Swiss-Prot record:
It comes from Pyrobaculum islandicum (strain DSM 4184 / JCM 9189 / GEO3). Its main location: cytoplasm. This is Chromatin protein Cren7. A chromatin protein, binds double-stranded DNA without sequence specificity. Constrains negative DNA supercoils. The gene is creN7. The keyword Amino-acid biosynthesis does not apply.
Length: 59
């Protein structure tokens, strides 16, 4: 997870694009479904949004 937090991602919100580093990231994997990595991003205007940044292969 450390490499996910150190990388910048392109986040689109309200028609604008930002290059931001995530504040927090976690894996969401319901039973029997492929998982995803979700990250929280803090926008320059103070809003916090979450976005799927990676899909995990089915296990």
């Amino acid at each position: 997870m450390e490499e996910v937090l150190d990388r910048e991602y392109e986040v689109e919100y309200g028609g604008r694009k930002y290059r931001l580093k995530p504040v927090k990231a976690w894996v969401l994997q319901p039973p029997g479904k492929p998982g995803v990595v979700i990250a929280l991003f803090k926008l320059p205007d103070g809003k916090t949004i979450r976005k799927v940044i990676m899909k995990l292969p089915p296990s």
